[in-house]
Amino acid sequence: MTTKVITAEDVRKVAHLARLAIDESEIEALTQQLDSILDYVNQLSELDVTEVPPTTRAIEVSNVTRPDVLAPWPNREDLLAIAPEREDDFFRVPKIM
């Protein structure tokens, strides 16, 4: 580890903002852990990545889905019968807005 970046006061402030109750032993442990994480991030920022092309994924991934196909349900009444709530021929769902 190079230089200390995170102080105990920083940890207390973040804990307060996040509404976390932590004791002094946790503050000391979190200070060391966060400092180690930031030291590692600092090491990564020193890497020369000018020749590395920007990517969104490390490996190529393709979406393996089928197209949606509209198909009638064999028995509409059976489906509506198991709905928690219904209104005529429709599912009734809670209002969200």
Swiss-Prot record:
Gene Ontology BP annotations: glutaminyl-tRNAGln biosynthesis via transamidation; regulation of translational fidelity; translation
Pfam families: GatC
Family: Belongs to the GatC family.
Protein function: Allows the formation of correctly charged Asn-tRNA(Asn) or Gln-tRNA(Gln) through the transamidation of misacylated Asp-tRNA(Asn) or Glu-tRNA(Gln) in organisms which lack either or both of asparaginyl-tRNA or glutaminyl-tRNA synthetases. The reaction takes place in the presence of glutamine and ATP through an activated phospho-Asp-tRNA(Asn) or phospho-Glu-tRNA(Gln).
InterPro entries attached to this UniProt entry: Asp/Glu-ADT_sf_sub_c, GatC
Transmembrane segments: none
Protein name: Aspartyl/glutamyl-tRNA(Asn/Gln) amidotransferase subunit C
Organism from which the protein derives: Thermosynechococcus vestitus (strain NIES-2133 / IAM M-273 / BP-1)
Domain of life: Bacteria
NCBIfam families for this protein: gatC
Subunit structure: Heterotrimer of A, B and C subunits.
Keyword Nucleotide-binding: yes
One Gene Ontology molecular-function label: glutaminyl-tRNA synthase (glutamine-hydrolyzing) activity
Catalysis: reaction(s): L-glutamyl-tRNA(Gln) + L-glutamine + ATP + H2O = L-glutaminyl-tRNA(Gln) + L-glutamate + ADP + phosphate + H(+); L-aspartyl-tRNA(Asn) + L-glutamine + ATP + H2O = L-asparaginyl-tRNA(Asn) + L-glutamate + ADP + phosphate + 2 H(+)
The keyword Ligase belongs to this UniProt entry's keyword annotation: yes
Swiss-Prot/TrEMBL keywords: ATP-binding, Ligase, Nucleotide-binding, Protein biosynthesis
